[in-house]
């Protein structure tokens, strides 16, 4: 099995067991980035020297028993609107091309504490105002599955980096779909956490009452693990709360859960293959005990105008 067939948690387990080194995993990802970036262009900034130095330190701390988190030593990346001390944070804009923060965002501090190894900053729509990752000053990001297609946005670089297995997970931000939509375009898992569950301190804001930082990962278990690592009340963000940390059971059952199927989303123009895949997922939820319910949501026609008004207010 290739290193890149593993999920983040599977790699983390091998690192803890000494079967794979954090430095080995980091160097493998850096080599993959070098190979993939000419066509995918998921990154604005790659920090190979800092990443290897970080991996060496983390590996020593794992071997000494100091770092035991299941994601310790796992290579990852950060969307380029989250502050990283000493590493430029551009929002994919010419205006911030040379902006280097003097502090880490709270989420970066949390990942540092568990032993994450950051390889760089990922591309995005400029100032997160887009849904295709085509408006970046630093160039267009391509969908790794089909280079003629977009990866979605605005966290398209993070989604593409995970889909291309350049990293094992990445941070994105979501205001009106900027994690969830590129996750769907790139075939990875993305979560917009409940508002307030993850600190926004150090996130360059688009719409402060809507923004949330969240993960893009290979699967749901990775997403739960990364989300849990990010969560927690933060004195630097007055809107943050001590929300319950997600725990995935070994055997999922969804008895009693009602899942709405909005008919407005299944109208004319929807690709038949997309419809089939969505319903496959719905029927899998049904198999696990959920009840599928067709729902009418006429209010949906107001969602985009309302979003534009609120986001730009």
What function would you assign to each model-found segment?
Residues 58-74, 222, 251-260:
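Immediate post-signal peptide segment of exported/extracytoplasmic ligand-binding proteins
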Residues 70-107, 131:
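Enzymes and membrane/adaptor proteins characterized by extended Gly/Ser/Thr/Asp/Glu-rich
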Residues 101-230:
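Short glycine/serine-rich loop segments
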Residues 192-281, 299:
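A short helix-breaking turn/cap at a secondary-structure junction
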Residues 49-56, 115-116, 125:
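Long amphipathic alpha-helix in the N-terminal Rossmann-like dinucleotide-binding domain
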Residues 1-52, 63, 287-288:
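An N-terminal boundary/leader segment
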Residues 19-27, 56, 248, 270-296:
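Acyltransferase
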Residues 29, 51, 73, 79, ...:
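Conserved hydrophobic/aromatic pocket- or pore-lining residues that grip, position, or stack substrates
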């Amino acid at each position: 099995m290739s290193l890149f067939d593993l999920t983040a948690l599977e790699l983390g387990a091998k690192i803890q067991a000494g079967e794979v080194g954090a430095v080995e995993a980091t160097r493998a990802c850096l080599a993959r980035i070098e190979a993939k970036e000419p066509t995918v262009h998921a990154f604005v900034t790659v920090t190979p020297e800092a990443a290897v130095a970080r991996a060496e330190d983390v590996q020593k701390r794992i071997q000494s028993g100091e770092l035991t988190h299941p994601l310790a030593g796992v290579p990852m990346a950060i969307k380029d609107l989250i502050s990283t001390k000493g590493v430029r944070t551009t929002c994919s804009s010419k205006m911030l091309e040379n902006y280097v923060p003097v502090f880490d965002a709270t989420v970066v501090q949390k990942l540092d504490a568990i032993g994450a190894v950051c390889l760089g900053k990922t591309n995005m729509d400029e100032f997160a105002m887009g849904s295709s990752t085509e408006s970046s000053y630093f160039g267009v990001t391509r969908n790794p599955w089909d280079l003629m297609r977009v990866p979605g946005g605005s966290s398209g670089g993070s989604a593409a980096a995970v889909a291309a297995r350049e990293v094992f997970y990445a941070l994105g931000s979501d205001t009106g779909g900027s994690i969830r939509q590129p996750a769907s375009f790139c075939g990875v898992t993305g979560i917009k956490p409940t508002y307030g569950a993850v600190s926004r301190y150090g996130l360059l804001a688009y719409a402060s009452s809507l923004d949330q930082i969240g993960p893009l990962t290979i699967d749901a278990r990775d997403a739960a693990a990364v989300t849990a690592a990010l969560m927690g009340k933060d004195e630097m963000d007055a809107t943050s709360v001590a929300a319950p940390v997600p725990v995935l059971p070994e055997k999922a059952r969804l008895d009693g859960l009602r899942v709405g199927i909005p008919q407005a989303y299944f109208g004319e123009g929807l690709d038949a293959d997309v419809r089939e895949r969505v319903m496959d997922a719905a029927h899998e939820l049904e198999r696990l005990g959920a009840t599928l319910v067709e729902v009418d949501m006429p209010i949906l026609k107001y969602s985009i105008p309302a979003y534009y008004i609120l986001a730009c207010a």
